């Protein structure tokens, strides 16, 4: 094992034997990795605060040579505790959904500084009550590509042609529909919703932060993202399943809400 220094966001903490913990972080230098923190459960441990879930910390570790093997913690220094996340159930749920995506077993073991920056910004914003719900939505949207996920927002998904105007976003197939391809029995969508999706697609996690937020649109987008991650990509996320128990996400309520929001200003 070689000794290395990393900065990481703590994603998971698991008790191991009586006094030890297994900590999983997403780091700036190596992506996702896990290490054993010996004695971390002792009251006298100097590493306690740096190991709390959602904390941002500097770590010195003895890194395993194998990517998915357990490394060993030498020291941890807290940079930012993000403890306010735990004071709000909703914010804790939002942050947990983000961490559950990165904790998928076979992914994120390589260095990706853009993802690290995005994760750090999302966790900080949720902690600081800076559009916490939107930061979760944006993180999920901009992480789709890491799973090979894709929503067609540049052309009609049916005829594969670009159009100046689109009549709807197909909520089942995650793609835009042009005037030539929409069926007579289909409802057209509010053009502002279509522009909202396209604006997200044309920006990044960081640049989208400066634009006005439409919470009604983002409630719909969040439900679509949860369904896409769970059903199309096939990930397992306990916090996603928990948030889907909220009344607004229940099928009857959601589709009634969606109809009301998306058919208000169609072209």
UniProtKB/Swiss-Prot annotation:
Family matches, as Gene3D superfamilies: Nucleic acid-binding proteins
SUPFAM superfamilies: ArfGap/RecO-like zinc finger, Nucleic acid-binding proteins
Pfam family, one: RecO_C
GO biological process: DNA recombination; double-strand break repair
An annotated GO cellular component: bacterial nucleoid
Key words of the record: DNA damage, DNA recombination, DNA repair
PANTHER family xrefs: DNA REPAIR PROTEIN RECO (PTHR33991:SF1)
Task of the protein: Involved in DNA repair and RecF pathway recombination.
Family statement drawn from the similarity comment of this UniProt entry: Belongs to the RecO family.
Protein name, entry field: DNA repair protein RecO
Organism: Mesoplasma florum (strain ATCC 33453 / NBRC 100688 / NCTC 11704 / L1)
The gene coding this protein: recO
């Amino acid at each position: 094992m070689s000794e290395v220094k990393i900065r990481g966001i703590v994603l998971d903490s698991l008790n191991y034997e009586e006094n030890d913990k297994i900590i999983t972080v997403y780091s700036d230098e190596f992506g996702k990795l896990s290490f054993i923190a010996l004695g971390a459960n002792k009251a006298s441990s100097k590493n306690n605060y740096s190991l709390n879930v959602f904390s941002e910390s500097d770590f010195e570790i003895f890194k395993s040579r194998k990517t998915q093997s357990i490394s060993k913690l030498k020291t941890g220094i807290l940079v930012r505790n993000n403890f306010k996340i735990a004071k709000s159930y909703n914010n804790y749920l939002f942050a947990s959904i983000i961490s559950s995506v990165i904790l998928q077993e076979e992914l994120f073991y390589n260095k990706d500084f853009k993802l690290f920056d995005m994760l750090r910004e999302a966790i900080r914003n949720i902690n600081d009550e800076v559009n916490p719900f939107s930061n979760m939505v944006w993180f999920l949207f901009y992480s789709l590509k890491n799973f090979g996920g894709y929503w067609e927002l540049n052309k009609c998904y049916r005829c594969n042609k670009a159009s100046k105007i689109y009549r709807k976003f197909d909520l089942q197939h995650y793609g835009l529909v042009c005037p030539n391809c929409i069926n007579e029995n289909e409802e057209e969508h509010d053009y502002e919703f279509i522009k909202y999706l396209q604006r997200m697609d044309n920006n990044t996690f960081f640049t989208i932060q400066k634009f006005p937020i439409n919470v009604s649109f983002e409630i719909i987008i969040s439900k679509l993202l949860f369904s896409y991650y769970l059903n199309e990509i096939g990930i397992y996320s306990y916090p996603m399943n928990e948030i889907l128990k909220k009344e607004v996400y229940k099928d009857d309520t959601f589709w009634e809400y969606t109809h009301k929001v998306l058919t208000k200003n169609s072209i």
